[in-house]
Amino acid sequence: MKRLLAFLVCAMAAGLAQAQPERFSREKYIDKGDTLYYRMLFPDANRQRKYPLVIFLHGSGERGADNDAQLKWGVMNFATDQNMLAHPAIVIAPQCPEHQTWSSTTPDKDRRRMTLNADPSKPMRLLIALIHKLDTAMPIDTNRIYITGLSMGGYGTYDALERYPNLFAAAVPVCGGGDTSRVASIAHIPMWIYQGAEDPAVSPLYALAMLEALTNAGAHPGFTQYPEVGHFSWLGAYSDPLMMEWLFRQHK
């Protein structure tokens, strides 16, 4: 499996060399004195048509206010020449401020489940407000809004789905966890879950608990667990061409 993961990463290396951060414009959203910095990729295509919207949530190590760090992992795979030609999309990569999180949850002691808190985190509130602003101001296909994230962003992906179950057309949570008691409301959303079996930072039990709960609720999520892989399962996830093809086929 390590060889397969290495192959997937190497296969994307040439394309990533062409995907420059400058393709993402620098933006910020301000609401009631709070600021959410984000980068935006707009496809080099017909600006008169509508495009899918991809929301990419980074991990805890990329928090800050430089509006750069959130491009470090994963999201650049959406900006390769090959992907932009095959799957033109508007991609939003927000940056969570220091000492804050995308999700607002309380983990259970058994490290298998999360409990969704009543109110969203401030970054999540700002993100959802930004999405609603963009879908009225930009050529977005509201039947094809996708969300994905890694580590802290994986938790954030589940958080967004469970709070706003009618907003998203598909999701790809990578090494994250959610509130299993709320999966009935999101069982209709196509999902592909990724996890490293040896992850020391995000217990695989979280992903497995969500997989079990979703399946019991009648969902049919995709699930890829990399044996002998730790916390960097996103290297394989976002280099997986099958996942990319699958994601852009989804719609409400």
Question: What does each model-identified segment do?
Answer:
Residues 1-22:
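Bacterial Sec-dependent N-terminal signal peptides
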Residues 60-124:
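Active-site machinery of serine-nucleophile hydrolases
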Residues 174, 190-252:
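C-terminal catalytic histidine-bearing segment of alpha/beta-hydrolase fold enzymes
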